[in-house]
């Protein structure tokens, strides 16, 4: 496995991985130059993107882990754990002290391992349909 930090990942490779994990492709969104992250890590097996994590941040206090995707063939093999460990290490080195993540309930035990806990404040969201 090769872990690449903050190197360009093609929109097609990201979209293929999203599709493999059951998410929508978003290829045109990834091609938009405004679609950037504060930091990301990509994992490759040979030349195939098999894992990806990214976060958005103000670069000072807060970071939000936006996506953690592991190709189904590589799930349960420690790839997601390693990506989380590397991301958290990087953010701590940058002295970013509040890291948040939104996840499906069945993934709670995974995120518990990294010290995540429910926030005591309300969280709300809205979606602007096109």
Regions found by a protein language model. Give the residues of each.
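Short amphipathic alpha-helix that is part of the acyltransferase structural core
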Residues: 1-28, 122
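A conserved beta-strand-loop-helix scaffold within acyl/acetyltransferase catalytic domains
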Residues: 29-40, 44-46, 51-69
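Residue-level recognition of the GNAT/N-acetyltransferase active site
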Residues: 71, 104
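Conserved acetyl-CoA pyrophosphate-binding loop and the N-cap/start of the following alpha-helix
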Residues: 74, 78-86
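Conserved GNAT acetyl-CoA-binding A-motif
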Residues: 91-103
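Conserved catalytic-core motifs of GNAT/GCN5-like acyltransferases
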Residues: 102, 112, 117-130
């Amino acid at each position: 496995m090769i872990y690449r930090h903050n190197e360009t990942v093609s929109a097609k490779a990201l979209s293929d991985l999203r599709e493999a994990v059951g998410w929508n492709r978003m290829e045109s969104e990834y091609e938009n130059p405004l679609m950037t992250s504060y930091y990301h890590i990509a994992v490759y097996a040979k030349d195939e993107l098999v894992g990806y994590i990214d976060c958005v941040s103000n670069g000072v206090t807060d970071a939000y882990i936006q996506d953690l995707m592991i190709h189904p063939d590589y799930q349960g093999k420690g790839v997601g754990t390693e990506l989380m460990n590397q991301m958290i290490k990087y953010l701590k080195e940058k002295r970013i002290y509040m890291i948040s993540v939104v996840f499906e309930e069945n993934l709670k035990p995974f995120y518990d391992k990294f010290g995540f806990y429910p926030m005591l404040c309300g969280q709300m969201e809205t979606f602007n349909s096109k």
